[in-house]
Structures are given as structure tokens and as C-alpha cells.
């Protein structure tokens, strides 16, 4: 990762951890239900997957700090992902992260903005009307003024559709809705 950061070919580094029990899947029951929606797994399989993911090797504090230092040195933007606590925001703020991707609650989105971070939600979340993992509703967050940007996430066409959904179903001014995606 460091060599890519130093190559000049990277514009953004996002520190992501999808380990069940924190972030997007703080609630292990939600993780299990989501997993069962994608795969034919038993409760025992879910427990095994949770254990394996929780025990898997992750970047250490020192490694994250070192990568963030290289990113800052190279002018690469730093993002945090699935922010779920003030402690995580404080840690990421200390790394000079300027983006909070997919804060999991309205309180965390507001706290990220209070720290000067740009907040991002997924346009598919706007289309669905809710998070697929039971977290922050992008519609609610946009209406509360807690989201700065909508991204395509896993469905690029959702960007344009989200603009009209925000206008038609949330009463957001069309220019403000377009500003979220452009």
C-alpha cells in the first residue's frame, strides 16, 4: 500500500474494517441476517464466520499511523469508513482524515461534520429509503443537513435516481440534490 501511495497514482486512501462487531455491523444479529440473505448459511456457520473475521490479521495502530503519514506527505486524502463512535472519529481526526464515509448514525454524521470532516452517504441508500445493514438512512441524514456528498457505492446509476428521489419524496430543492452528486 505504501508503494502505491508513493507512486503518485493514488488520490484517496480509505481505512476500512468490515469486521463484525463494530462499524457497519456493530450488531452481530444484523450481520448474521445480512449474511443469510446472501448465502445459504446456518447460525453455526455465521458464528464461525464472525470468529474467523474477528481473528483475522488486521493493520496495527502503528501501520495505520504510518500509512496516514505517507498519505499526508504525498497529498493523498484520507477517509474513515463506517464510523460508529466518537472514539473512532477522534482517532481518524488525529490522522487528519477529512472524509467520513458512511457514518452509521445521525449523531456520528453530525459529530464528523463538527470535526470538519466531509460526510458521504450512498445513493443506493437514498433509493432504498434505508441502509441495507440497518444503519443511517441517507434520506434522513440529507434532510438533517448531515451529509455533504452522495456516492454511487455499489450502483452507479443510483446517483441520478437519488437526485430525483430526494426532490420527489423528500422535498429537497433540485439544485441542492444535484449538488450532492456533482
Where are these regions (language model features)?
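Short beta-strand/loop segments at the ligand-binding rim of alpha/beta enzyme cores
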Residues: 71-79, 95-96, 118, 122
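Metal-coordinating catalytic core of metallo-dependent amide/deamination hydrolases
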Residues: 1-85
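Glycine-enriched alpha-helix->loop->beta-strand junction motifs that scaffold or abut catalytic
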Residues: 7-11, 91-99, 114-120, 145-148
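A general structural motif
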Residues: 58-61, 80-82, 99-109, 128-135
Amino acid at each position: 500500500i505504501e508503494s502505491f501511495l508513493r507512486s503518485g497514482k493514488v488520490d484517496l486512501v480509505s481505512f476500512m474494517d468490515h469486521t463484525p462487531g463494530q462499524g457497519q455491523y456493530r450488531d452481530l444479529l444484523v450481520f448474521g441476517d445480512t449474511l443469510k440473505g446472501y448465502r445459504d448459511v446456518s447460525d453455526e456457520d455465521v458464528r464461525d464466520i464472525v470468529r474467523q473475521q474477528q481473528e483475522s490479521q488486521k493493520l496495527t495502530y502503528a501501520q495505520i499511523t504510518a500509512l496516514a503519514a505517507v498519505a499526508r506527505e504525498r497529498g493523498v486524502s484520507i477517509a474513515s469508513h463506517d464510523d460508529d463512535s466518537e472514539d473512532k472519529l477522534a482517532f481518524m481526526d488525529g490522522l487528519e482524515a477529512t472524509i467520513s464515509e458512511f457514518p452509521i448514525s445521525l449523531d456520528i454524521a453530525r459529530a464528523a461534520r463538527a470535526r470538519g470532516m466531509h460526510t458521504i452517504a450512498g445513493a443506493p441508500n437514498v433509493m432504498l429509503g434505508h441502509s441495507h445493514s440497518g444503519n443511517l438512512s441517507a434520506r434522513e441524514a440529507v434532510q438533517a443537513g448531515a451529509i455533504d456528498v452522495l456516492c454511487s457505492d455499489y450502483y452507479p446509476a443510483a446517483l441520478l435516481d437519488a437526485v430525483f428521489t430526494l426532490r420527489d419524496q423528500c422535498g429537497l430543492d433540485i439544485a441542492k440534490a444535484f449538488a450532492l452528486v456533482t
